[in-house]
From Swiss-Prot:
Its cofactor is [4Fe-4S] cluster; Mo-bis(molybdopterin guanine dinucleotide). It comes from the Bacteria. One of its GO terms (cellular component) is cytoplasm. Binds 1 [4Fe-4S] cluster. Binds 1 molybdenum-bis(molybdopterin guanine dinucleotide) (Mo-bis-MGD) cofactor per subunit. Its EC number is 1.97.1.1. This is Chlorate reductase subunit alpha. Keywords: 4Fe-4S, Cytoplasm, Iron, Iron-sulfur, Metal-binding, Molybdenum, Oxidoreductase. Heterotrimer of alpha, beta and gamma subunits. It comes from Stutzerimonas chloritidismutans. Optimum pH is 7.5. Reduces chlorate and bromate. One of its GO terms (molecular function) is 4 iron, 4 sulfur cluster binding. It catalyses: chlorate + AH2 = chlorite + A + H2O.
Amino acid sequence: LNMLEPVGETLASEYPYXK
């Protein structure tokens, strides 16, 4: 699991890094 680069849509939604 990459906290800096979430490859999962669910992860990106819960943890919008960079966005």
